[in-house]
């Protein structure tokens, strides 16, 4: 659809491969099949990317944007946290995901004109009520029934039956941006006997060095502050 949108003249594709209209890249494209010819009567005033500009590429945490208009899906944080079916236990780039839990907008946020795209001009009471529960700690401790019935229909890039990815993504973000306030949450999660998603291999333990240590006691994992 991006290519079709560009050919139709409603926007352009920039160096990070996202489709941009005059209002930026935070757009959702839909296509309609019709049996009548259309005449394009409005010319867009979109300026192309500057030849030497590489803000989007420099902002990519995993260097997935290898060159202008070239992106490796195997290393894109947005793909790895959603539909690619990644396995955190074997993902070598997990410590570069920063705070991203679902998707990634780093390359879009870096584009200067997108910085003006988010405007608090409308109120969405239902969204505000829901988002107050959508924090890293809330996700980690959430019931799977809530993730399945409330979260997944809205953040559907993670497919049904894979709701555990919300938890692993949130835990990964907590490890990447460790704060002592996370320790009780990690402990509680461990006691829930789902530690296989948290502290399962030596690579994860290395990331916790100097932050959280793991002590195996009575057959369960206990996390504590060093």
Indicate where each model-derived feature is located.
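Alpha-solenoid helical repeat architecture
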Residues: 158-160, 190-191
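Short Fe-S-cluster ligation motifs
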Residues: 84-102, 136-158
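Amphipathic alpha-helical scaffolding segments comprising HEAT/armadillo-like alpha-solenoid repeats
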Residues: 147-153, 179-190, 211-219, 224
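Structural detector for internal amphipathic alpha-helices that build alpha-solenoid repeat scaffolds
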Residues: 167-177, 199-208
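Catalytic cores of enzyme domains
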Residues: 1-132
